[in-house]
Amino acid sequence: MSFVVIIPARYASTRLPGKPLVDINGKPMIVHVLERARESGAARIIVATDHPDVARAIEAAGGEVCMTRADHQSGTERLAEVVEKCGFADDTVIVNVQGDEPMIPPAIIRQVAENLASAQAGMATLAVPVHDAQEAFNPNAVKVVMDAQGYALYFSRATIPWDRDRFAQSRDTIGDSFLRHIGIYGYRAGFIRRYVTWPASPLEQIEMLEQLRVLWHGEKIHVAVAAVVPGTGVDTPEDLERVRAEMR
């Protein structure tokens, strides 16, 4: 199937300034992400950024850049600007690959596009099982709960579902009920155009999770378990050092 990858790459970051350009073993992080996306079979790959230095790094690597405004509140809002500038038809499948995932497996980029095509949902995403208690209680690891058909009920930085009886005894171990959301999304261009017309929801603003806007406005998000577990994303300086070590 045909799909387009857009990689939003915002330069400013409170925890890691200039994050897209941090060096990982001789290359800017955003270039590593671009190279992974190239292996996914995407028909077109566009890096959406608000900073000329990021644009120069991508162009030096032979990639396509779309310059966007600096005031977007989320990656999906940045994608919407690209969708309009490029004039994508409403039925174009767009995969949003985060610019801070230098170890993302190309296979799951394609997986989320294929899941969107087969699901009755405006949006598709992926998750992986959580087996580590520290991860289950980490607010930077977003958890998701789904219904019987694989559609998201809620995403949260909190530990959901809360295992009342187990956690009353101990929080050192967890069961098999937890899924960590992976920040990759598939949607059609027309859905992105609709998304940006909706006001931000209170839950989105509390949790700082853009996908909650979709659920708030009554749309479905299909969640599948990732075919390949992705490597570490980069949110903090500690994450960066871990990724550098893993990618050596």
Swiss-Prot record:
Stretches assigned to coiled coil: none
Primary localisation category: cytoplasm
EC number in record: 2.7.7.38
One Gene Ontology cellular component: cytosol
Keyword list, A-Z: Cytoplasm, Lipopolysaccharide biosynthesis, Nucleotidyltransferase, Transferase
One term of GO molecular function: 3-deoxy-manno-octulosonate cytidylyltransferase activity
Catalytic activity, as annotated: 3-deoxy-alpha-D-manno-oct-2-ulosonate + CTP = CMP-3-deoxy-beta-D-manno-octulosonate + diphosphate
UniProt cross-references to CDD domains, sorted A to Z: CMP-KDO-Synthetase
InterPro entries attached to this UniProt entry: Cytidylyl_trans (IPR003329), KdsB (IPR004528), Nucleotide-diphossugar_trans (IPR029044)
GO biological process: CMP-keto-3-deoxy-D-manno-octulosonic acid biosynthetic process; lipopolysaccharide biosynthetic process
Superkingdom as given in the UniProt entry: Bacteria
Subcellular location(s) per record: Cytoplasm
Regions that span the bilayer: none
Listed pathway(s): Nucleotide-sugar biosynthesis; CMP-3-deoxy-D-manno-octulosonate biosynthesis; CMP-3-deoxy-D-manno-octulosonate from 3-deoxy-D-manno-octulosonate and CTP: step 1/1; Bacterial outer membrane biogenesis; lipopolysaccharide biosynthesis
Entry keyword annotation includes Transferase: yes
Keyword Nucleotidyltransferase found: yes
Cited NCBIfam families: kdsB, PRK05450.1-3, PRK05450.1-5, PRK13368.1
Entry's family note: Belongs to the KdsB family.
Function (record text): Activates KDO (a required 8-carbon sugar) for incorporation into bacterial lipopolysaccharide in Gram-negative bacteria.
Name of this protein: 3-deoxy-manno-octulosonate cytidylyltransferase
Species in which this protein is naturally found: Cronobacter sakazakii (strain ATCC BAA-894) (Enterobacter sakazakii)
Lineage of producing organism: Bacteria, Pseudomonadati, Pseudomonadota, Gammaproteobacteria, Enterobacterales
